[in-house]
Amino acid sequence: MEPLVIAGKSYSSRLLLGTGKYRDFAETRAAVDASGAQIITVAIRRTNIGQNPDEPNLLDILPPSQFTLLPNTAGCYTAEDAVRTLRLARELLDGHALVKLEVLGDQKTLFPDVVATIEAAKILVKEGFQVMVYTSDDPIVARQLEDIGCAAIMPLASLIGSGMGILNPWNLQIIIDKATVPVIVDAGVGTASDAAIAMELGCDGVLMNTAVASARNPILMASAMRKAVEAGREAYLAGRMPRKIYQASPSSPAEGMFTGTQHPAANS
């Protein structure tokens, strides 16, 4: 398959994986390996990547030489907090510019605050960040974020951590059809079929965390998600047959059969 290209860099995997909620760093690494993910997102406010020298460092098991780390602003509720967090991430990662922006608007649902998200995106793009941005499934907001200069649009499929799957495929389809940057479904994926559906719609990738980390067997689920993303992408590229009513046809030709009778309803 053709690679996923984000901010000028190519990736063979279209599955992006988060690092939260695992039992320990060893399980995190095992899940990453099983998923085949190359872009790994890290919550800067919750995960140590050098801020706390006396604590285990995620970079020891997921070194930047092997993976593209995607610092994110999970837990930020203002544009100012989000910008400050990503500036810190850039310092900790020696000038790393590819980041995931999310500014939340509600602590219970974790819906994005799109006004604050747009505000933060403008600042970050101006400062040279390559911004992958978590947003609602509103096509107008998605276009505004692309116009600002975001490197990828990441609409939610449903609430973060809900596992409810894709609730509004029509809006996602509009975003995909109109976007000229990668569209990556972020939030709400619960199982492999959700990931496959997102890819069949034409999404360029899928980002997930809870669906893998909270599975009964996270490593096995990571492997399942890898296959689902690949299968969904191949199905999208292959092009599904059209849906039809009253035009059913057998998969094997009926002409030339030695025996058989015509169903009486065929002449009615």
From Swiss-Prot:
One Pfam family name is ThiG
Q: Kindly list the positions annotated as binding 1-deoxy-D-xylulose 5-phosphate.
A: G161, A187, G188, N209, T210
Question: Which InterPro entries does this chain map to?
Answer: Aldolase_TIM, Thiazole_synthase_ThiG, ThiG
Checking Gene3D superfamilies in the record gives: Aldolase class I (3.20.20.70)
Query: Which parts of the sequence are annotated with region: Disordered?
Result: 248-268
Q: Name one GO molecular function term.
A: thiazole synthase activity
Q: Please identify the protein, giving its name as recorded.
A: Thiazole synthase
Top-level taxon in the UniProt lineage: Bacteria
E.C. code: 2.8.1.10
List the catalysed reactions: [ThiS sulfur-carrier protein]-C-terminal-Gly-aminoethanethioate + 2-iminoacetate + 1-deoxy-D-xylulose 5-phosphate = [ThiS sulfur-carrier protein]-C-terminal Gly-Gly + 2-[(2R,5Z)-2-carboxy-4-methylthiazol-5(2H)-ylidene]ethyl phosphate + 2 H2O + H(+)
Which organism does this sequence originate in? Nitrosomonas europaea (strain ATCC 19718 / CIP 103999 / KCTC 2705 / NBRC 14298)
Cited function: Catalyzes the rearrangement of 1-deoxy-D-xylulose 5-phosphate (DXP) to produce the thiazole phosphate moiety of thiamine. Sulfur is provided by the thiocarboxylate moiety of the carrier protein ThiS. In vitro, sulfur can be provided by H(2)S.
Family of the protein in this entry: Belongs to the ThiG family.
> Which keywords label this protein?
Cytoplasm, Schiff base, Thiamine biosynthesis, Transferase
